[in-house]
């Protein structure tokens, strides 16, 4: 058995069911936080601006406009145990795989909806 096959077998156990989404989609990510001995869930909603990597190491970047119009970006590992669930709120229609140009645009961004 080669090392590559061994890695694939181990990764199969780690992969969990996640909805299909692409850059331009608006998603709501529920993240688990541990504060002392309590555990709570916090939602982070924004536009997916990039997907990178493959397999268990796949990550995605979500950007939203926070308080006072300041942009907030978070990079989430797709199969991390801290992610409780991912909901796709809106499907966006874009022509780029990486939406880094949204960083330079001030205010709210309008992305056409995909059917």
Swiss-Prot record:
Primary gene name: rplS
Keywords, ordered alphabetically: Ribonucleoprotein, Ribosomal protein
GO MF annotations, alphabetized: structural constituent of ribosome
GO annotations of cellular component type: cytosolic large ribosomal subunit
UniProt-listed NCBIfam families: rplS_bact
Physiological role: This protein is located at the 30S-50S ribosomal subunit interface and may play a role in the structure and function of the aminoacyl-tRNA binding site.
Originating species: Thermosipho melanesiensis (strain DSM 12029 / CIP 104789 / BI429)
Similarity comment: family membership: Belongs to the bacterial ribosomal protein bL19 family.
Gene Ontology biological process: translation
InterPro entries reported in the protein's UniProt record: Ribosomal_bL19, Ribosomal_bL19_CS, Ribosomal_bL19_sf, Translation_prot_SH3-like_sf
Name of the protein this chain belongs to: Large ribosomal subunit protein bL19
PANTHER family for this protein: LARGE RIBOSOMAL SUBUNIT PROTEIN BL19M, RIBOSOMAL PROTEIN L19
């Amino acid at each position: 058995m080669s090392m590559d096959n061994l890695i694939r077998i181990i990764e199969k156990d780690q992969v969990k069911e996640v909805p299909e989404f692409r850059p331009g989609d608006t998603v709501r990510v529920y993240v688990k936080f541990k504060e002392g001995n309590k555990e709570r869930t916090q939602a982070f909603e924004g536009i997916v601006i990039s997907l990178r990597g493959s397999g268990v190491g796949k990550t995605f970047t979500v950007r939203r406009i926070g308080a006072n119009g300041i942009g907030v970006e978070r990079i989430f590992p797709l199969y991390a145990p801290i992610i409780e669930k991912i909901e796709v709120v809106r499907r966006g229609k874009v022509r780029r795989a990486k939406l880094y140009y949204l960083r330079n645009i001030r205010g709210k961004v309008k992305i056409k909806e995909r059917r």
